[in-house]
Amino acid sequence: MSLDSLALPPAALAFLTDRHLATLTTLRPDGTPHVVPVGFTWDGERTVVRVITSRSSRKARNVAAGSRAVVCQLQGWAWLSLEGPCRLRSDRGDVRDAERRYAARYREPRPNPERVVLEIAVDRVLGLVERPSASSG
């Protein structure tokens, strides 16, 4: 089901703040998907997803080469995919902000002097976060 990323229902917002891992999909230079487990944060004011990683990671290199990205969070029957163009941010202030958000959702990230932020400007949301009723079927 497609959702309006600017007006996510309360159940979707709650799902995005619960402590879950997700997958991040980017494209390799040859066009094949690269899918890895990640922790991420959602910024509803700016409609962006942030993932922290090392500058030398494959996902960071894919994004630096100009990749769209998708984060998909799944828990039981509930799921959300957040898609959009992705850019690599290395400004120290951006990295600190992303680390702070990550720590609030998960835990304090370990020190990493090569840390960068992958920022997805969400332009499409797909998902199911409220269990369909038995009569809807």
Task: Please identify what each model-predicted range represents.
Residues 1-7, 77-137:
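Charged, gly/pro-rich active-site loop segments
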Residues 1-23:
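Short, basic/aromatic recognition patches
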Residues 8-11, 35-37, 56, 105:
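A generic local structural motif
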Residues 20-21, 68, 107, 125:
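Generic structural signal for secondary-structure transition and capping sites
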Residues 31, 66, 109:
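An amphipathic, aromatic/His-enriched active-site/gating alpha helix that lines ligand/cofactor pockets
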Residues 19-55, 69-72, 82:
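Short beta-strand segments
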